[in-house]
From Swiss-Prot:
<dbReference type="InterPro" id="IPR023639">
    <property type="entry name" value="DNA_primase_ssu_PriS"/>
</dbReference>
<feature type="active site">
    <location>
        <position position="103"/>
    </location>
</feature>
<comment type="function">
    <text>Catalytic subunit of DNA primase, an RNA polymerase that catalyzes the synthesis of short RNA molecules used as primers for DNA polymerase during DNA replication. The small subunit contains the primase catalytic core and has DNA synthesis activity on its own. Binding to the large subunit stabilizes and modulates the activity, increasing the rate of DNA synthesis while decreasing the length of the DNA fragments, and conferring RNA synthesis capability. The DNA polymerase activity may enable DNA primase to also catalyze primer extension after primer synthesis.</text>
</comment>
<keyword id="KW-0464">Manganese</keyword>
<feature type="active site">
    <location>
        <position position="235"/>
    </location>
</feature>
<keyword id="KW-0808">Transferase</keyword>
<dbReference type="InterPro" id="IPR002755">
    <property type="entry name" value="DNA_primase_S"/>
</dbReference>
<dbReference type="GO" id="GO:0000428">
    <property type="term" value="C:DNA-directed RNA polymerase complex"/>
</dbReference>
<dbReference type="GO" id="GO:0003899">
    <property type="term" value="F:DNA-directed RNA polymerase activity"/>
</dbReference>
<keyword id="KW-0804">Transcription</keyword>
<feature type="binding site">
    <location>
        <position position="119"/>
    </location>
    <ligand>
        <name>Zn(2+)</name>
    </ligand>
</feature>
<keyword id="KW-0639">Primosome</keyword>
<feature type="binding site">
    <location>
        <position position="128"/>
    </location>
    <ligand>
        <name>Zn(2+)</name>
    </ligand>
</feature>
<dbReference type="Pfam" id="PF20873">
    <property type="entry name" value="PriS_C"/>
</dbReference>
<feature type="binding site">
    <location>
        <position position="116"/>
    </location>
    <ligand>
        <name>Zn(2+)</name>
    </ligand>
</feature>
<dbReference type="GO" id="GO:1990077">
    <property type="term" value="C:primosome complex"/>
</dbReference>
<keyword id="KW-0235">DNA replication</keyword>
Length: 330
């Protein structure tokens, strides 16, 4: 049986995977990046480093690789005159993009397990009394749940395009859902929180009347209602907040090791290991015995028995708390 080292967040091996990725990653950055605040959550920290400003992708890459490797990486939806100012008023807001967030786990009942990483027993509380350590939680994200999120995203895109004449961009969040972003300029960028709330409520179907007897092919809400679409399930606060942080496209999500990825065609999206940039194999040491769906495949793990699995799967399982990546095997 393998030796448990109480994986507290991330190991140096996981950090090396992330650093090697960012050495060559082509991050999708806004053309006006000098007007954006950048932020990150470093490895081994529960707090964010904020109020960062960069003028080029090279400057950003140097900072990430050599000074502050990110577990999570963001830039602001807002444009500021002084994005590095620590006081929000001093930043001087100039407008914001329009954001929508769809979390697939809000659409499904997912299997959740809380356990002790030392003894492997299921535990209800946040601490194992037997071993005096904090417990870990694993939530199984299924392909079926992601499909539900994708369907909600498809409905949202239709509303934004057909009812508002907007050109939304869709991104897989890197973990459990989708981000939809509209690059805003002029009056769109200057929408305040109340106006954005009205847009959020519209796409959620709040206050939209029923249209019994209408055609499924009718435009707008008449057709949607008669197709059984009563609204889109979004995180309303994300849309309302004019100073929201956005995950940088092509960055890595620290809870999965998957890429925050542009989805140009929703019909082509698949929740599988191609969303991971990592190749080769890892030796993975499971904390518990479990059979679970991982990126579209069923994986069987036995507590304390090392297993050789693809790096994409091993890193995902590590970041999802199911065990530790012990070694990299080419």
């Amino acid at each position: 049986m393998g030796t448990f080292t109480l994986h507290q967040g991330q190991t140096n091996l996981i950090k090396s995977f992330f650093r090697n990725y960012y050495l060559n990653a082509e991050l999708e950055l806004p053309k006006d990046m000098e007007l954006r605040e950048f932020a990150l959550q470093p490895f081994g920290s529960d707090t964010y480093v904020r109020h960062l400003s960069f003028s080029s992708s090279e400057e950003l890459r140097d900072y990430l690789v050599n000074r502050n490797l990110p577990l999570h990486l963001f830039y602001s939806s807002a444009r500021y005159q002084l994005p590095s100012a620590r006081n929000m008023e001093e930043k001087a807001w100039m407008g914001s993009d329009l954001l929508f967030d769809i979390d697939a786990d809000h659409l499904c009942k997912l299997r959740s397990i809380r356990f002790c990483p030392v003894c492997g027993n299921a535990v209800v509380s946040e601490k194992c009394e037997r071993d005096n350590v904090e417990t870990l939680e694993y939530v199984e994200m299924t392909s079926e749940c992601i499909k539900r999120g994708l369907e909600q995203t498809r409905n949202l895109v239709e509303i934004l395009e057909d009812d508002f004449g907007l050109k939304p961009k869709v991104y897989f969040s890197g973990n459990r859902g989708f981000h939809v972003q509209v690059d805003c300029y002029g009056n769109c960028a200057l929408l305040d929180s109340d106006e954005r709330k009205e847009i959020a409520e519209y796409v959620m179907g709040i206050g939209v009347p029923g249209y019994p007897g209408g055609s499924e092919n009718a435009p707008g809400w008449v057709g949607r209602k008669n197709r059984g679409i009563n609204g889109v399930t979004i995180d309303e606060q994300v849309t309302i907040d004019v100073k929201r942080l956005i995950r940088i496209p092509n960055s890595l999500h620290g809870k999965s090791g998957l890429i925050v990825k542009r989805v140009p065609n929703l019909d082509d999206f698949e929740f599988n290991e191609t969303l991971s940039p990592f190749t080769g194999y890892t030796i993975f040491l499971p904390y518990i015995t479990i059979e679970t769906e991982v990126l579209g495949s069923i994986i069987k793990l036995n507590r304390g028995i090392p297993i050789k699995i693809k790096s994409s799967i091993g890193i995902y399982l590590h970041l999802r708390n199911l065990g530790e990546v012990k070694a990299y095997v080419r």
